[in-house]
């Protein structure tokens, strides 16, 4: 396979950095959809077959979109830099049905879990301290239902009793960088390079069931919940592999450090990883047996499970530069050009697997031409890259 490839096509709508991408494979739709958010508060719902927007929405005052999560029942949770988590309908009306204040002073996303009909749980950074976690429960029918279950949770004291490798100097875990969920367990990646997995039980206790130091002392940049494990990335050139089965049993014993319980069998830390041909990995996805990795330097690579490089994608910046000095300075301009990264920054990454779409309802389409286009699209897996210049590139895998 040629290691350098151009995109099959590019979606153009956003005028600013595409800060998050989210594929929606909804049972009522004839084909997968894509949601994109940008640095000026715009959200767009895309028809991937016709390659054009279905509808779009701009949040008042144009705050940067931090993260997107599809909840259920046609609701999209949107975190923005106005310190708000909004729940919007994606039926074209973009009606806001709920709003929660959330700390967005750091890089962290958020996590929403469904508890019951209309009831949800929110895990996010503490409103004042980005090194700790708040947990809320609420019902979408009432703004007054918002209840903070835990305030300012910190895990450092609970895990400080664990045996750390020689050379570790850990006096705190740092700010929360990333949240995700895997088989009901909540995972958070920390600035110190630790990944911590915990459960919430009925009596309000927090159970720590997993701890990894695989990226210490480098910060966690991304977490991806795959089919078999969770993958993590950092500023180093390795991908952390987090398998909860090696640290979890039917009913483990816990040591109490109220309100946090630490699993007694958790006497050692996980450090399973694979080295990859790229560093500063800001975004990570896995599609079937393919690993998608994007760096801070604007490169995206595709590898197989043996970390064999299969493809590399990048987008060049505009080479036109404006020099306001009327006399100019050829030497300084040449030095500046050489020192700058020629690639456009990757600001978001998403993947679409052909296997995830095999049960799609595209056969209900009565338009023969549309049905053929859907079939051709779903035959392939796709690497979808959002760039700092607002473009969204689609690469066939």
Curated annotation (Swiss-Prot):
Bias-annotated ranges (Low complexity): 332-356
Ranges where the record places region Disordered: 324-356
WD repeats: from-to residues: 16-56, 212-252
Annotated Gene Ontology cellular component terms: nucleus
Ranges in a coiled coil: none
Record text on subunit structure and interactions: Component of the ASTRA chromatin remodeling machinery complex.
Keyword Transmembrane helix: no
The organism's taxonomic lineage, starting at the top: Eukaryota, Fungi, Dikarya, Ascomycota, Saccharomycotina
UniProt name for this protein: ASTRA-associated protein 1
Key words of the record: Chromatin regulator, Nucleus, Repeat, WD repeat
UniProt keyword Repeat, yes or no: yes
Subcellular location: Nucleus
Example GO biological process: chromatin organization
Primary role: Component of the ASTRA complex involved in chromatin remodeling.
Species of origin: Zygosaccharomyces rouxii (strain ATCC 2623 / CBS 732 / NBRC 1130 / NCYC 568 / NRRL Y-229)
């Amino acid at each position: 396979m040629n290691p350098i490839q151009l995109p099959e096509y590019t979606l153009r709508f956003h005028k600013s950095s595409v800060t998050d991408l989210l594929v929606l494979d909804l049972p009522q739709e004839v084909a997968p959809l894509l949601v994109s958010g940008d640095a000026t508060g715009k959200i767009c719902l895309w028809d991937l077959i016709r390659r054009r927007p279905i509808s779009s929405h701009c949040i008042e005052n144009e705050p940067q979109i931090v993260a997107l999560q599809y909840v259920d029942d046609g609701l999209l949770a949107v975190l923005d830099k106005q310190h708000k988590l909004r729940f919007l309908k994606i039926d074209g009306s973009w009606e806001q049905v709920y709003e929660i204040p959330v700390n967005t002073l750091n890089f962290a996303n958020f996590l929403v879990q469904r508890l019951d009909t209309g009831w949800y749980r929110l895990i996010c950074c503490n409103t004042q301290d980005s090194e700790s976690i708040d947990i809320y429960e609420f019902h979408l029918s009432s703004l007054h239902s918002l209840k903070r279950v835990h305030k300012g949770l910190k895990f450092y004291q609970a895990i400080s009793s664990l045996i750390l490798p020689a050379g570790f100097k850990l006096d705190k875990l740092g700010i929360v960088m990333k949240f995700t969920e895997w088989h009901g367990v909540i995972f958070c990646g920390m600035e110190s390079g630790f990944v911590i997995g915990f459960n919430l039980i009925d009596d309000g206790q927090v159970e720590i069931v997993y701890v990894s130091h695989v990226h210490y002392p480098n910060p966690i940049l991304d977490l991806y919940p795959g089919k078999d494990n969770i993958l993590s990335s950092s500023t180093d050139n390795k991908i952390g592999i987090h398998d909860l089965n090696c640290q979890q049993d039917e009913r483990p014993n816990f040591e109490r450090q109220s309100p946090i319980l630490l699993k007694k069998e958790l006497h050692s830390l996980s450090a399973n990883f694979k080295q990859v041909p790229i560093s500063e990995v800001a975004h990570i996805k896995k599609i079937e047996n393919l690993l998608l990795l994007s760096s801070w330097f604007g490169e995206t690579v595709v590898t197989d499970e043996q970390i064999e490089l299969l493809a590399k994608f990048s987008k060049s910046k505009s080479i036109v530069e404006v020099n306001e000095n009327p006399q100019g300075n050829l030497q300084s301009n040449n030095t500046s050009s050489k020192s700058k990264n020629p690639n456009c920054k990757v600001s978001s990454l998403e993947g679409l697997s052909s296997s995830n779409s095999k049960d799609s309802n595209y056969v209900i389409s009565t338009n023969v031409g549309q049905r053929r286009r859907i079939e051709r699209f779903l035959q392939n897996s796709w690497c979808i890259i959002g760039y700092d210049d607002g473009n969204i590139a689609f690469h066939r895998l």
